[in-house]
């Protein structure tokens, strides 16, 4: 990711994820961006989706979180995503503030409409979520932007990772970083 502060001579790039920690409040989201800047992080990352673009509004076991989940047990996925998403109209103030504070701002798109939307901000890099590693059309569309791509491989098999890398390369991605990650979070304090 040559355009970003990465490389052996530069040390690690610290990316802070806002996710749904804004609790539905733009002022809180902007406060989080300021707090991230105070830590010296290089970048702020958000997620770009709506409940309608990431799941279906149905109430069946396949679309409900299991009862045993500590935080979200028995909730419908649609309701959780509706509550946790970052409204698209917030992207501009979040990205602008992050840039103003000297940080890179980028996002994880979860569908093609999100990529089209993010391109209006000329984001410098995209991250593909672990669970989207099998969404080869999304990976190819991101690759076609010509931007660097961070591909999380935490849930992928070796074959799925190979297919995702091939999709990125076929879309023209020449700046690809594979990110090994855990897809079970928040982390338990003992694991931190």
Predicted feature descriptions by range:
Residues 1-192:
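Catalytic cores and adjacent flexible loops of soluble metabolic enzymes
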């Amino acid at each position: 990711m040559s355009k970003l502060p990465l490389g052996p001579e530069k040390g690690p790039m610290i990316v802070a994820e806002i996710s749904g920690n804004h609790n539905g409040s733009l002022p809180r989201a902007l406060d989080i961006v300021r707090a991230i800047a105070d830590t010296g992080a290089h970048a702020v990352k958000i997620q770009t989706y709506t409940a309608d673009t990431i799941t279906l509004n149905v109430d069946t076991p396949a679309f409900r979180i299991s009862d045993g989940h500590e935080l979200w047990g028995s909730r419908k996925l649609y309701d959780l995503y509706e509550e946790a998403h970052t409204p698209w109209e917030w992207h501009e103030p979040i990205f602008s503030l992050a840039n103003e504070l000297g940080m890179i701002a980028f996002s994880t798109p979860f569908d093609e409409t999100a990529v089209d939307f993010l391109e209006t901000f000329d984001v410098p890099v995209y991250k593909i979520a672990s669970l989207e590693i099998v969404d080869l059309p999304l990976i190819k569309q991101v690759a076609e932007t010509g931007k660097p791509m961070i591909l999380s491989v935490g849930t992928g098999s070796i074959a799925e990772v190979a297919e995702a890398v091939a999709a990125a390369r076929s879309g023209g991605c020449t700046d690809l970083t594979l990110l090994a990650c855990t897809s079970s979070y928040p982390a338990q304090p003992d694991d931190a």
